[in-house]
């Protein structure tokens, strides 16, 4: 008899218009939403298979944050990990990653939480890019967390972002188990 799925809850956070909902809908419903409708908050569910184990995952797609917005207490209760999304075409959204991470750490009173930083919209033309791949990697290294670029439009690295999140959660829950040799996974 297969083991029961482990329950995991992930919050998707980031500035407005970075593609948080697009990443989530692409991952859960396997399609890309062309039009933009600001999200208030949605919750999605999907089973993620990671290292042979099923994870019943609840994904909380939050409204966009800015430095003055307050993350709701619902964004902390029972959350196992955070995917912080920025747009590679927005320097401001990249700069907000640090602010959002600090808000999460301060609210939880923690030095480290399971995080994945995702640079979304990697399909945009190079002249639209304001944040380099190396800058994203360096931020992941600084935060000691996983990092990847992704494109919800092209379905590039979307599943990888969620797999990395489960990996970061599992690493934090089972610190004695090696997770590929280092604290940070760069893709």
UniProtKB/Swiss-Prot annotation:
Chain segments annotated as coiled-coil in the UniProt record: none
Subcellular location: Cell membrane
Site (Important for autoinhibition of GTPase activity): 36
Positions where lipid (S-farnesyl cysteine) attaches: 184
Recorded phenotype for the gene knockout or disruption: Reduces virulence in a mouse model of invasive pulmonary aspergillosis. Impairs growth on poor nitrogen sources. Exhibits increased uptake of arginine and leads to asexual development in submerged cultures, even under ammonium-excess conditions. Also shows enhanced sensitivity to the TOR kinase inhibitor rapamycin.
Binding site for Mg(2+): 21, 39
Residue numbers binding GTP: 17, 19-22, 33, 36, 39, 120, 123, 152
Gene induction: Expressed throughout the developmental cycle and induced by nitrogen starvation. Expression is up-regulated when the organism is grown in cultures with the presence of human endothelial cells as well as during infection in mice.
The entry's keywords: Cell membrane, GTP-binding, Hydrolase, Lipoprotein, Magnesium, Membrane, Metal-binding, Methylation, Nucleotide-binding, Prenylation, Virulence
SMART domains recorded: RAB (SM00175), RAS (SM00173), RHO (SM00174)
Recorded catalytic activity of this chain's protein: GTP + H2O = GDP + phosphate + H(+)
Post-translational modification, as annotated: Farnesylation is important for efficiently activating mTORC1-mediated signaling.
Residues that coordinate or bind GDP: 17-22, 33-34, 120, 123, 152
PROSITE patterns: RAS
Membrane topology: Lipid-anchor
CDD domains per UniProt: RheB (cd04137)
UniProt motif Effector region: location: 36-44
Keyword flag Endoplasmic reticulum: no
Main location, first listed in the record: membrane
Family: Belongs to the small GTPase superfamily. Rheb family.
Function in brief: Small GTPase that acts as an allosteric activator of the canonical TOR pathway, an evolutionarily conserved central nutrient sensor that stimulates anabolic reactions and macromolecule biosynthesis to promote cellular biomass generation and growth. Plays a role in virulence.
Protein name (Swiss-Prot/TrEMBL): Small monomeric GTPase RhbA
Chain's gene name: rhbA
